[in-house]
Amino acid sequence: MQAATETIAAIATAPGRGGVGIVRVSGPLAGRIAVEVSGRELKPRHAHYGPFLDGGGQVIDEGLSLYFPGPNSFTGEDVLELQGHGGPVVLDLLVQRCLELGARQARPGEFSERAFLNDKLDLAQAEAIADLIEASSEQAARNALRSLQGEFSRRVHALTEQLISLRIYVEAAIDFPEEEIDFLADGHVLGLLEKVRTELSTVRREASQGALLRDGMTVVIAGRPNAGKSSLLNALAGREAAIVTDIAGTTRDVLREHIHIDGMPLHVVDTAGLRDTEDHVEKIGVERALKAIGEADRVLLVVDATAPEAADPFSLWPEFLDQRPEPGKVTLIRNKADLSTEAIGLEESADGHVTITLSARTNAGLELLREHLKACMGFEQTAESGFSARRRHLEALRLAGNALEHGHAQLIHNGAGELLAEDLRQAQQHLGEITGAFTPDDLLGRIFSSFCIGK
């Protein structure tokens, strides 16, 4: 445990007025501040009701005082919580009193940072505190809570332990060549490597869902001109966010709209119609559309169900096939069902392709699309599954996966145990960045500075 030399104080509740407001203090002076502010010795881990006093003995407010001697506290240090009325003036006066007694104003996230430095929680758990506070849906809150309780960290630690076991075996074989262990003939190394690769792939998939729930999914609406893309955007947004006319090429640029479906964030992008054009401005719009398609989490390929070309929608624009994400991230939308004889509905092919027939003009079938998008974001996860994750976690998992893939290739094609050992070391280091076992100080500063003051 790292002993802090400074005592910090801050308001721990949200800005504004409320029934209850909390001032939090952490550090070696917390016990003395507790006595000075409450006017008496506090029994550890008990709530004491009474006045909060200023330097002249005048009452600032009345409320509960709770003192938690370290290391049995959130930060691992001596901690004091003053729970009074939630007026900003009263809370500011309490903080000023703590500063007069030797504390300093806490930086954003400094309480959580001290908890991390004192091994009360790891970095993924610390980030989950902020994710839980900022959760915009029940499922996102559940996932953040599971990460705070250590679910994500346990999965990462399990992977790390498997890597350590594998490294011990491989490096022992390298250090004692007289044993003449044949990595390929032995089969033990390959078996362990396959096991950790499979588990890492599962964790990456679940982490990706967790990141979508936290950050929101980027959905790009693409298709030919006049397929009803802007009408679909307006239907999802519930307002006239885009201009809709019968003139082909009305949308010439990328239009972004942020919406929520049952509290889940969605970043919807309307794009220019995909076609060959001599119009310079429209060409730029098409280029931007293709770029947006390549960056999307989900692409809604909209086709006019009444058009003859709708029979083979993926042949409408060959460049779309080059720019789109993997096939599983494309949903075909057969629009204008109110003008065709097609029934409203959702169909999923044997290879996993989803087609939704709807009418953006009448909103028929729109609820099917909403439910489909919720499922794509992991909304159907149960309370017992899933965890919160961030983009940096996904990058660390990706790099760890790349290292394992490279090590596997070296082992299969070259039987190179030395190179495999280095790849395993790199994979372990990337996983350590998630929990903070291997994390640069500048990254820690960026992470905790994004927290609320008082957290």
From Swiss-Prot:
Q: What Pfam families does UniProt report for this protein, alphabetically?
A: MMR_HSR1, MnmE_helical, TrmE_N
Q: Which UniProt keywords apply?
A: Cytoplasm, GTP-binding, Hydrolase, Magnesium, Metal-binding, Nucleotide-binding, Potassium, tRNA processing
InterPro entries linked? G_TrmE, GTP-bd, GTP-bd_TrmE_N, GTPase_MnmE, MnmE_dom2, MnmE_helical, P-loop_NTPase, Small_GTP-bd
What domain of life does the native source organism fall in? Bacteria
- The UniProt record gives the binding positions of K(+) as 226, 245, 247, 250
E.C. no: 3.6.-.-
Concerning CDD domains, the annotation shows: trmE, TrmE_N
Question: In this UniProt entry, which cysteines form S-S bonds?
Answer: none
User: Where on this chain does (6S)-5-formyl-5,6,7,8-tetrahydrofolate bind?
Assistant: 24, 81, 120, 455
Record's cofactor remark: Binds 1 potassium ion per subunit.
Which residues bind GTP per the record? 226-231, 245-251, 270-273, 335-338, 359-361
State the Gene Ontology terms under molecular function: GTP binding; GTPase activity; metal ion binding
- Where is the protein found, in the record's own terms? Cytoplasm
Domain called TrmE-type G: residue spans = 216-378
**Hydrolase among the record's keywords?**
yes
Which positions in this protein are listed as binding Mg(2+)?
230, 251
Cofactor requirement: K(+)
Write out the similarity annotation: Belongs to the TRAFAC class TrmE-Era-EngA-EngB-Septin-like GTPase superfamily. TrmE GTPase family.
Task: Describe the task this protein carries out.
Answer: Exhibits a very high intrinsic GTPase hydrolysis rate. Involved in the addition of a carboxymethylaminomethyl (cmnm) group at the wobble position (U34) of certain tRNAs, forming tRNA-cmnm(5)s(2)U34.
HAMAP family, per database record: GTPase_MnmE
Q: What is this protein called?
A: tRNA modification GTPase MnmE
Organism of derivation: Pseudomonas paraeruginosa (strain DSM 24068 / PA7) (Pseudomonas aeruginosa (strain PA7))
Q: Which gene encodes it?
A: mnmE
